[in-house]
């Protein structure tokens, strides 16, 4: 078993890490780190458990340690659910010795830090060697993208491989859990929609092109098509919905696009990794699907569901669809865990 820990263990994504790591066949959760306010106390005493499942008994009495490299003990991999401002300061310190699989945004766009979706760009893990050489670390940092970016890019990948994408427009309807438990006051979101999420549109527009780019002699060359995003917070607990419009340079048959999505598999599926969904993208034909309440938990929340796939008659060589992905599973903790499973398998 590989000993692992969670940084930022008391927050919503930290709790999702704990839930997904409980009874994991390869990883044993031995360390929970949080702020100095929580350090030295049992996890069950300091964590206000938010998830709609019971807190695992294995962590209830586990003593929380400070978020400091000297405090985490004998671990091999650390999963980071830290806020971006904290992550930027402390993740490099941990990476001097440990493997850090980070969900935080702080280091994502560093030129020597792999930003990875295992089904999309596993070859970017080659940057680990570059990172260690440049920074003199024994460990390293690997990051996963923004939650909305992950769902979008998983659906774009089979299309990108088969056609030439000219531009992508995406409008997101994002669950409140993406902002954390205290992120959106109930009076601000009930009977309402908030048409702005700070920094979200920029993340989608840059990360998507980065992920679909090429690694050339240690340098990522982003994909060259345009991405335009508009992001909205909606009164849904879990599960981001995205309306996607794609313009291609090529003529296409919509049935071929559907087949490409349905048959899409990546390295995690070939390797049979524990957290890998059987199908990264599940295509549904019902007119009223996908819906977050009905589809966010597809394959344990690790698959993205696509529906309303159709040609767009208003524009040449264009298509549209709607997707739903679980933002704290596939879009956060599950993404980091799948990255770690891949690293554990191939490195």
Curated annotation (Swiss-Prot):
NADP(+) binds at residues 10-13, 37-38, 177-178, 327-328. GO terms for biological process: 'de novo' L-methionine biosynthetic process; diaminopimelate biosynthetic process; lysine biosynthetic process via diaminopimelate; threonine biosynthetic process. CDD domains: ASADH_C_arch_fung_like, ScASADH_like_N. It catalyses: L-aspartate 4-semialdehyde + phosphate + NADP(+) = 4-phospho-L-aspartate + NADPH + H(+). Gene3D superfamilies: Dihydrodipicolinate Reductase, domain 2, NAD(P)-binding Rossmann-like Domain. Its EC number is 1.2.1.11. Keywords: Amino-acid biosynthesis, Diaminopimelate biosynthesis, Lysine biosynthesis, Methionine biosynthesis, NADP, Oxidoreductase, Threonine biosynthesis. Substrate binds at residues 174, 200, 233. The active site is at residues 147, 240. Belongs to the aspartate-semialdehyde dehydrogenase family. This is Aspartate-semialdehyde dehydrogenase. The gene is asd.
């Amino acid at each position: 078993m590989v000993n692992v820990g969670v940084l930022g263990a008391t927050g919503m994504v930290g709790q999702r890490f704990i839930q997904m790591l409980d009874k994991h066949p390869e990883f044993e959760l031995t360390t929970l780190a949080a702020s100095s306010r929580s350090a030295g106390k049992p996890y069950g005493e300091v964590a206000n458990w938010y998830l709609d499942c019971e807190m695992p008994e294995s962590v209830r009495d586990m003593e929380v340690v400070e978020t400091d490299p000297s405090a985490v003990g004998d671990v091999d991999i650390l999963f980071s659910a830290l806020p971006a401002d904290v992550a930027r300061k402390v993740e490099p310190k941990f990476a001097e010795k440990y493997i850090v699989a980070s969900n935080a945004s702080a280091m994502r766009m560093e030129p020597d830090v792999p930003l990875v979706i295992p089904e999309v760009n596993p070859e970017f893990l080659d940057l680990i060697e570059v990172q260690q050489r440049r920074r003199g670390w024994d460990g390293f940092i690997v990051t996963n993208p923004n939650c909305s970016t992950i769902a979008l890019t998983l659906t774009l990948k089979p299309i990108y491989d088969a056609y030439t994408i000219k531009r992508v427009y995406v409008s997101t309807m994002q669950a409140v859990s993406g902002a954390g438990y205290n992120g959106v006051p109930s009076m601000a979101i009930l009977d309402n929609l908030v048409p702005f999420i700070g920094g979200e549109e920029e993340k989608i527009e840059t990360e998507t092109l980065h992920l679909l780019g090429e690694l050339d002699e240690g340098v990522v060359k982003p994909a060259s098509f345009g991405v335009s995003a508009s992001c909205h917070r909606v009164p849904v607990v879990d599960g981001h919905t995205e309306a996607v419009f794609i313009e291609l340079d090529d003529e296409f048959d919509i049935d071929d696009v559907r087949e490409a999505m349905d048959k899409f598999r990546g390295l995690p599926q070939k390797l049979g990794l524990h957290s890998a969904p059987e199908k990264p993208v599940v295509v549904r034909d019902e007119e009223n699907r996908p819906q977050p309440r009905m589809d966010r938990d597809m394959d344990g929340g690790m698959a993205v569901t696509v529906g309303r796939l159709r040609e767009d008659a208003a524009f040449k060589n264009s298509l549209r669809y709607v997707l739903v992905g679980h933002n704290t599973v596939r879009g956060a903790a599950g993404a980091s865990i799948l990255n770690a499973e891949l690293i554990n398998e191939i490195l």
